[in-house]
Amino acid sequence: MLDFVGLGLFDEKDISLKGLEKIHNADKVYVEFYTSILMGTDLEKMEMLYKKKITVLSREDVEQHAEDWLVDAKDSNVVFLTGGDTMVSTTHVDLRLRAADMGIKTTLIHGASIASAICGLSGLQNYRFGKSVTIPHPYVSNRGVRVVSQTPYDTIKNNIEAGLHTAVFLDIDKDKGYMTVNQAMEILLEVEGKLGEGVMVDRLAVGIARAGSPSPVVKADYIEALRDYYLGGPLHIVVIPAELHFVEAEALVKLAGAPEGILENID
């Protein structure tokens, strides 16, 4: 048996009682921190609360050598822990499919997800979100050219044209660290400067930091202003809204400090 258990958003206490029960009954417990990380805890605190030894898996362990440890689930109870909800990442869906191919039964214990948290924190309506996207850190190519991905810009543009909000995840890089809202705004404006399509001009954005923690920060403002706003430590995420419903606009003003001018000319 392989149980996928979502840990929630921030620390070791976010796990559900069902998830905790699965861990207590497990023969082996694994966790991966590369698709998402709980900023409010560490492995030692998790093992202390869960009263179980936890083995950390690398990206290679999960994506390239999963069969090496999945085989344990053929004749014992194995728990695989992930930040957030357990099936939001395509990587975890693929892992479940590989387990199925090996004849291993799987169960899911869901956890709080950033996808729902950003709606609750900002007041934006969850059914109005389109395709999400990740802004990667720029890098220098082998030819010495700075490469900035245009994909986030295009995704946001397409969603806006369809009347849909965009959840923009920010890159986590072992060398460059956690991307901030400020860096993300700078990148979007840089691409705007190159393309000149006006997508990011006078565009409202919502920056969210440390969702699920005791002290989350939510700030809505125009991209140029949000670029200079300090939201504190990681993890950060951005939402680029499309045309707002009145209740959404009111929520952004009252809950996220958006400029009151966004309430004008909204039905």
UniProtKB/Swiss-Prot annotation:
It comes from Methanococcoides burtonii (strain DSM 6242 / NBRC 107633 / OCM 468 / ACE-M). Pathway: Protein modification; peptidyl-diphthamide biosynthesis. Homodimer. GO terms for biological process: methylation; protein histidyl modification to diphthamide. This is Diphthine synthase. Keywords: Methyltransferase, S-adenosyl-L-methionine, Transferase. SUPFAM superfamilies: Tetrapyrrole methylase. The keyword Transport does not apply. The gene is dphB. It catalyses: 2-[(3S)-amino-3-carboxypropyl]-L-histidyl-[translation elongation factor 2] + 3 S-adenosyl-L-methionine = diphthine-[translation elongation factor 2] + 3 S-adenosyl-L-homocysteine + 3 H(+). S-adenosyl-L-methionine-dependent methyltransferase that catalyzes the trimethylation of the amino group of the modified target histidine residue in translation elongation factor 2 (EF-2), to form an intermediate called diphthine. The three successive methylation reactions represent the second step of diphthamide biosynthesis.
